[in-house]
Amino acid sequence: MEPGFWHEKWQQQLIGFHQQDINPFLVKYWQTLALPADAKVFVPLCGKSLDMCFLAEQGHQVIGCELNELAVQQFFEENQLPMKKSAEGEHQHYHTEQVSLYQGDIFTLPQSITAKVSGFYDRAALIAWPESMRTQYAKQLAQLLPSGSVGLLVTLDYPQEALSGPPFAVSPTWVETHLSDDFEIQALACQDVLADNPRFVKKEVPWLNEAVYLLRRK
């Protein structure tokens, strides 16, 4: 996916991937990670996700990375969070006391920024990449995460031929095959969410499963 694709989506506000509510899997399973309240938590390709507010409410220091500037600005504006902005290398750094968002390319994000994170949360990042680029992203995520860090991965799976992504279909087999070198993987839950996604229903996609995994960086 070229950067221009995502910039155009945000500019036109064609952001069906943005959830209006906190992800139920996050609420149900986050405590499974048993992270201390003051843990630093990394959220890749964070957009303006309300899930970051949930993480901050747990006491965590949230570190996000997002390509699009408008998404970052809208996060702070819509949640009425006064923020400061500064340049940090190739990225723009928007931050409050608890939330630090780095606007720019995740593939050039310095490892020093995530060196002290102990948790991570990926709901919309892995599924944003077509299969041809997904492995590259997964390796970059692994490089950014310290050994021993734990997180939740949320995926969607459906017959890919039924609909062109994003979001792209990520099967349990793909997760096991491509992530097991860098992560210990535990499948926590999987449920059919087709009825909650009108776009998939309209395109007559026969099934749509949302799954959540606990990942631990080796």
Curated annotation (Swiss-Prot):
Which controlled-vocabulary keywords does the entry list?
Cytoplasm, Methyltransferase, S-adenosyl-L-methionine, Transferase
Q: Which Pfam families match?
A: TPMT
Chief location of this protein? cytoplasm
Q: Where in the cell is it found?
A: Cytoplasm
Catalytic activity field: S-adenosyl-L-methionine + a thiopurine = S-adenosyl-L-homocysteine + a thiopurine S-methylether
> Which residues bind S-adenosyl-L-methionine per the record?
W10, L45, E66, R123
| Stored InterPro entries | SAM-dependent_MTases_sf (IPR029063), Thiopur_S-MeTfrase_Se/Te_detox (IPR022474), Thiopurine_S-MeTrfase (IPR025835), TPMT (IPR008854)
Q: Name one GO molecular function term.
A: thiopurine S-methyltransferase activity
For this protein, the Enzyme Commission number is 2.1.1.67
Q: PROSITE patterns of this UniProt entry?
A: SAM_MT_TPMT (PS51585)
Cite the PANTHER family for this sequence.
Answer: THIOPURINE S-METHYLTRANSFERASE
For this chain, the family text in UniProt reads: Belongs to the class I-like SAM-binding methyltransferase superfamily. TPMT family.
Official protein name in the record:
Thiopurine S-methyltransferase
Species of provenance: Shewanella sp. (strain MR-7)
Q: What is the lineage of its organism?
A: Bacteria, Pseudomonadati, Pseudomonadota, Gammaproteobacteria, Alteromonadales
